């Protein structure tokens, strides 16, 4: 089992020892099909084109490791949050390589830091992120530009040769993701309960709601066929629709209330996503969110 190191004894090893940060995600990756939504190994690629044909995403899994999953992407959320924290501190030389101890990372993303199996799963996730290939024209700015990258340029673990104990790990973010973090408005806050969502589809739906619903007074409406295409799901549309309706009926996403709308002009159902704090206070789904990265409006702050 890996032990948490005594950082005072390792001054040569920079550790981003920040496990209680407000969470951030890079906004360009939140609504498109960049990750597998299933925990089972996916070896089929994702090929997505927006309805207007102006945006496309292609994701290619490694045959040995499979495609990076939306649970693997928790590591990227943590890394994005670390970079944003450096920016907020006023750091001027922000590296693409982040060094840390796996114990701290596992705690930060809501995983157990106890037991060898959790560290093995972390290493497998890092392998999938390093070997999943992505091509997209997102952020092309109207030009015929294509970005090709992996979710991590590399990762490595530093092990004490004498004790065989881990002194830490490091990951290097790809330039595409790194520039997206540094760009103005390039990140969005993520609710801390996101890591408690167990289903891949629920996790992705939260990201869609956060990206599109935001703080819009009337929320955001999206048709089921459009959601299905954006998800990159391998399951048949009929099964996807059944699962999505059950998720809407449970209505357990952090921050956002889901309403299933069965009768639409197209004949297909749609989903209404609206922020709970914007509902009328008498609505059963209303919930005021007090988050550590946001302050309540003046007059509503607790004494």
Tell me the role of every PLM-derived stretch.
Residues 1-303:
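Charged, alpha-helix-forming regions
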